[in-house]
Amino acid sequence: MLTADALDQADALFDFFSGHGINNVGFNMEETEGENAQSTLERPDGERRYRAFLERLWQRMSERPGVMRLREFDGIASLACSDERLQNTDMNAPFAIVNVDARGQVSTFDPELLSVQTEAYGDFSFGNVLQHSLAELADTPKFQRVLAEISSGVERCRQSCGYFGLCGGGAGSNKYWEHGTFDCSVTQACRYRIQLVADVVLAGMEQQLGLVA
């Protein structure tokens, strides 16, 4: 989990992981979500520091190839080296993920939405696994409202964002917690998870391939 305090520790983190033989690493970002009303990464210098953090990790990994792989770098690099582009994600496609709580209440889209209570939507339970089929859940007014807003938000991303093929329209929970609605586009979470990572990876690949002076 990366917070603002971690952004000055790229060398320490690389040395720790490589020194302990941990060669596959993935970072989760501190997000504005649920009880965490504000991420420390939202500070004014957060994006600059995060980019510098990623650039330093890229440099260290390039100096010692094979010692450590970073999930975030691998994901962007694999898309950049192929013709594949994302059209959506499991977290904005209905029933790609099915979430069931201890009472049998069923939600879909982001797992983070299960059991959440909100003023605008109530909770995000669409029915009960013991009483309803998925087809019945999909026919409820609440599900149709959430699906319509998530789909509209994905389309906003598709039409306005040059990173869409790397992101697939983002995660509904991030949009809701940051903007109060699913029907919106860019989030701070996407800036950190996709956009800034893509900028660093593509710049690093171009340099390694001799495509820049």
Question: Model segments located where?
Answer:
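Radical SAM enzyme [4Fe-4S]-AdoMet core and its adjacent flexible, acidic
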Residues: 1-106, 111-129
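Flexible mid-to-C-terminal extensions adjoining Fe-S/redox cofactors in radical SAM and related proteins
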Residues: 116-213
